Amino acid sequence: MRTSLGRLILLTCVAALTSSSASVVGASGYASIGADSAMRAAPASAGATLTFRRIFKSSSPEFIEISVREDSDEASYEIRQLDDDPGATKFEVSSGLRARMFALAQQLNRFQGQDLDVHRKIANLGEKTFRWEQGPETHEVKFNYTLNSTASQLLQIFEGLARQQELLMLLERRMKYDRLGINDALLQFETELNRKLLPEPERALPTLDQIAGDSRFVDIGRQRARNLAERIRHQS
């Protein structure tokens, strides 16, 4: 009887120990898997967004804002008069141009502690703002005119993108509502292309090809569109 009782107690202890060990291993295993899953699910730090804004009353346009994302070709622009309804439109900026823009912003310390304005009595050229946003981090700097070469390079790119989108908007309006005026719009595009002010003129190729192939437009306009498209492809 005593022997049987002793064996029963021993078996009970072994079973309890085995169950406890399995629970610990199981808990450990699930904790490890959970941690791995959490690490895999945790999003990478969000890419930065670079924004340029210019407000220049009594000019045309009075308001320009362009936002470019570090991790995406998708960007947005808003070009209008101040009295117009606000609303951004999507467009694309290549990875190469974005890399250059963000490199310039980094050289400006992401606009932290920067004083870019020339601080001289000169004409009002419009209030310009550079803004860096990345998660909770936000920095911006405002200026009228700057002599900082790095800031000037970044400004030239942003203003070039704005002018590029303005011209594309003009071409699209003429295509829809004023086909006889298409050649004048193409001349404006050609002038800016000659001045090398358009950062990515290849963005206009689909529009130029459409004009060149559409018999509803005047021949001189179609030929100019064809020549511009050929020139841009050759330069690219």
Which residues make up each language-model segment?
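Short, surface-exposed linear segments at secondary-structure transitions and domain or protein termini
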Residues: 75-77, 96-102, 147-158
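Short, well-ordered, aromatic-rich surface patches in folded extracellular/luminal domains
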Residues: 22-56, 115-236
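Bacterial N-terminal signal peptides that target proteins for export
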Residues: 1-10
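Short amphipathic beta-strand/extended segments with alternating polar/hydrophobic composition
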Residues: 65-69, 88-93, 136-147
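Acidic/histidine-rich, surface-exposed loop or edge segments in extracytoplasmic proteins
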Residues: 74-89, 187-191, 205-209
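N-terminal secretory signal peptides
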Residues: 39-84
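Bacterial N-terminal signal peptides
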Residues: 9-19
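A short-motif feature that recognizes glycine-rich, charge-decorated loops
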Residues: 77-113
